[in-house]
Swiss-Prot record:
CDD domains: AdoMet_MTases. GO terms for molecular function: tRNA (guanine(46)-N7)-methyltransferase activity. This is tRNA (guanine-N(7)-)-methyltransferase. HAMAP family: tRNA_methyltr_TrmB. Belongs to the class I-like SAM-binding methyltransferase superfamily. TrmB family. Catalyzes the formation of N(7)-methylguanine at position 46 (m7G46) in tRNA.
Length: 216
């Protein structure tokens, strides 16, 4: 998805202290960014922020970090944060490929990957956020026995990702090929999820557990 650049977006982000442009400063101590030592959960590709905002509102004792590359969607996420006066969310405008530069090992307790680009062409598979090269990074940055929650509308991406997680040494805790008809009760919908579901598209979902004792 390519977005038309909005000249007003960057100044609005830069004027808000909840938006972090120097995340490397907090690499050793993300508690400093929040002013507490609550667990850190991370959403990779937060889009317009409906999901992360509802998570933060329901779980005030968890610190949420929302990452996206596009200022235009981050502004919309930030506005939702401010409308609800949420103090447990921070926003980082950056490329997800740079995660290792801003987090130390064993720091993150949960990662959410919602409706990422499926990159259907085989020559682009390495760009998928569930590709083994990304999973190996997440695994280092996450605490042992922590979880990745992954949702997608794309059948091929989901099937391939099941293999990716297994190859990377994650333990599959839960999977469904039709989330909205499943027994899973903790789901929070994203904007894309509502759109796809209204079109009759089945949502695929899985929970994968970090096992640092299992070699990939």
């Amino acid at each position: 998805m390519r977005l038309r650049r909005k000249a007003w977006a960057r100044p609005e982000l830069e004027s808000d202290p909840k938006v972090i442009y120097n995340p490397m400063h907090y690499k050793e101590n993300w508690q400093e960014a929040f002013g507490n030592n609550h667990p850190v959960h991370l959403e990779l590709g937060c889009g317009r922020g409906q999901f992360i905002n509802q998570c933060a509102e329901l779980n005030p004792h968890i610190n949420y970090i929302a990452i996206d590359l596009y200022d235009e969607v981050l502004v919309k996420a930030l506005r939702k944060i401010n409308e609800k006066a949420l103090h447990n969310v921070r926003v980082i405008p950056m490329n997800i490929a740079k995660l290792e530069s801003i987090f130390k090992h064993d720091q993150i307790e949960k990662i959410y990957i919602n409706f990422c680009n499926p990159w259907p062409s085989r020559r682009h598979h390495h760009k998928r956020l569930t590709h083994p090269q990304f999973l190996s990074v997440y695994k280092k940055l996450m605490k042992d026995h922590s979880e990745i929650w992954f949702k997608t509308d794309d059948d091929e991406l989901f099937k391939d990702s099941l293999k990716y997680f297994a190859e990377a040494g994650f333990i599959e805790k839960y999977r469904t090929f039709d989330l909205h008809q499943s027994e899973f009760t903790e789901n929070i919908k994203t904007e894309y999820e509502e759109k796809f579901s209204n079109q009759g598209v089945k949502i695929k979902f899985g929970i994968f557990v970090v096992n640092k004792g299992r070699q990939n």
